[in-house]
């Protein structure tokens, strides 16, 4: 019925989070696992193999297929899991799970109920970010948080913890080909748009999952901003028109507001990081926000299903 896939790079370095991610999947009635592991060593695959052996799960482990691209990305990892599922299994549902996401009790019941609807192609469990795993039991969904989550999903999709219908995946492969390998940050937006273009429904479940990445948190606390990376992948996503504004007028008005907020942001960052680094971080953050808002507006005005095909699509599957 169900195949579980995990997309990871150095997941074992996340320690307890990674192990709890694995344990939480036991609520799902799967017998087979697909591990797409682009790690720097074999520590992650060893942890997953130990888990699979302990719980009687069949494990198929591999690195990403590159599909003619120069390196592994989140898009190649996700597409590899999809292709392995379509090629090697007859099950109707593929679950894709990121390595820092812990499913909350009841996640599978909600996903299974959603996919009983024959027109539903994707189920996404809302992810609740926490700074400390001890906060996991106290997460509450208030109105503001719910609105922010829904707006973000409708703008650019989410794939942290998703259940996908086989026929929807096969239809996407046939109509649009592979997820563009260059979409390292926005492969989730592409997948959502492809689902919608083919008329498949998407359901968000609010039992959801906890997301906690200790590596990213430590970088954020140190003031690490990967602005060049964010800018590059936002520009790449713009080619496909997959990031789209939900409230067009609001996003247009917020373009100048983002610039107006720069002095306050600079003050806050320099207080925390010092004058030179603080200014650099504030400018980088503002640049990223401006470009993202512009791309959202552009996507809402010009995005279409015809833009989804990868520009360098291969003639045969690798």
Regions found by a protein language model. Name each.
Residues 208, 219-248, 290-301:
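Catalytic core of nucleotide-sugar-dependent glycosyltransferases
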Residues 11-27:
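Short, well-formed alpha-helical segments that are part of the catalytic scaffolds
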Residues 90-102:
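Short beta-strand-to-loop acidic/aromatic patch adjacent to the donor-nucleotide binding site
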Residues 202-214:
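Catalytic beta-strand/loop signature of glycosyltransferases that borders the donor
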